[in-house]
């Protein structure tokens, strides 16, 4: 199985500043010009919401302050400027092969 390691496990960011979350895969999740990495946001009592698919594509309806980048084994989610409603736990997930594993999550607090 591909192991996804997120860092940091938690972070606190001031309103209006930048939040950066990293995800490292134990082997490449990129092939044929695509990077099969996705980012989700989850708030308590709610299902995960897809933010970014295929490393850098913004899901419809997601604010442009969310952006994703990376390829191969190293990926980043950026949120800028952070808003109060962004307080949540963020997860990376790959779909390069089965099982489609998730990272351990990053809890974002807004100061």
UniProtKB/Swiss-Prot annotation:
Region of interest (Complementarity-determining-3), residue spans? 93-101
Which PROSITE patterns does the protein's record reference? Answer: IG_LIKE
| S-S bonds | 23-92
The regions listed as transmembrane in this protein's record are none
Does the record bear Disulfide bond in its keywords? yes
Q: Where is this region: Framework-3?
A: 61-92
Query: Which portions of the sequence form the region Complementarity-determining-2?
Result: 54-60
| Top-level taxon of the source organism | Eukaryota
Cite the InterPro entries for this sequence: Ig-like_dom, Ig-like_dom_sf, Ig-like_fold, Ig_sub, Ig_V-set, IgV_Light_Chain
Q: Where is this region: Framework-4?
A: 102-111
Is this entry keyworded RNA-binding? no
Q: Where is this region: Framework-1?
A: 1-23
Complementarity-determining-1: annotated segments: 24-38
Tell me, which GO biological process terms does this entry list?
A: adaptive immune response; immune response
Keywords attached to this Swiss-Prot or TrEMBL record, sorted alphabetically, are: Adaptive immunity, Disulfide bond, Immunity, Immunoglobulin
| Any GO CC annotation of this UniProt entry | immunoglobulin complex
Q: Where is this region: Framework-2?
A: 39-53
Question: Protein name, please?
Answer: Ig kappa chain V-III region PC 6684
Per the UniProt entry, what species is this protein from, by scientific name? Mus musculus
